[in-house]
């Protein structure tokens, strides 16, 4: 059976950048594990802030977090109260100095991670999975996505046997390296069990000058 490679790992160094940017020889395993814990911790604290991506940079003993969010006001808070609280929580939890940068996502309708989380939240509210998929697909196409594919896997509509349903609109060329493919994954925790949601959004081609030559 054909398997699908992760769209980010497939394009790293070509048209996608690493989400953890640092170098270490002796502490490499510890840093990888700590990065995972930092992301889980921040995601849990900012669950309702529309957080799409957490990039981590390290220099010396300091850690720099770049948060991409659809709702920067919730992350920063009035007069920066919330972001300062987050910085203090991170310092207490991990014992390091953190600097935080917040980037706003202008079009959350074509951000694959936010789209996947939106579908998962609808499934948790008992919205029919086909309706949730079609609604988000039409919104993504309306806001400039050239193609989108959504899959939902699990006990859909409370069925006895788990299955996978998918819906696609437009082109989603997963094997084309120059294609700008955004990928997101989320889990919906329903009374019947966990339903996995995957989203691929095609935003057009990235034409590299060296590749063209």
Curated annotation (Swiss-Prot):
SUPFAM superfamilies per the UniProt record, alphabetical: Prokaryotic type KH domain (KH-domain type II) (SSF54814), Ribosomal protein S3 C-terminal domain (SSF54821)
Pfam families: KH_2, Ribosomal_S3_C
GO biological process, one term: translation
KH type-2 domain span: 38-106
Alphabetical keyword list: Ribonucleoprotein, Ribosomal protein, RNA-binding, rRNA-binding
UniProt keyword S-adenosyl-L-methionine, yes or no: no
Domain of life: Bacteria
GO (cellular component) term, any one: cytosolic small ribosomal subunit
GO MF term list: mRNA binding; rRNA binding; structural constituent of ribosome
InterPro entries, alphabetized: KH_dom (IPR004087), KH_dom-like_a/b (IPR015946), KH_dom_type_2 (IPR004044), KH_sf_prok-type (IPR009019), Ribosomal_S3_C_sf (IPR036419), Ribosomal_uS3_bac-typ (IPR005704), Ribosomal_uS3_C (IPR001351), Ribosomal_uS3_CS (IPR018280)
Record function comment: Binds the lower part of the 30S subunit head. Binds mRNA in the 70S ribosome, positioning it for translation.
Family statement: Belongs to the universal ribosomal protein uS3 family.
Subunit (UniProt): Part of the 30S ribosomal subunit. Forms a tight complex with proteins S10 and S14.
Protein name, entry field: Small ribosomal subunit protein uS3
Species whose genome carries this gene: Desulfovibrio desulfuricans (strain ATCC 27774 / DSM 6949 / MB)
Gene name, Swiss-Prot/TrEMBL: rpsC
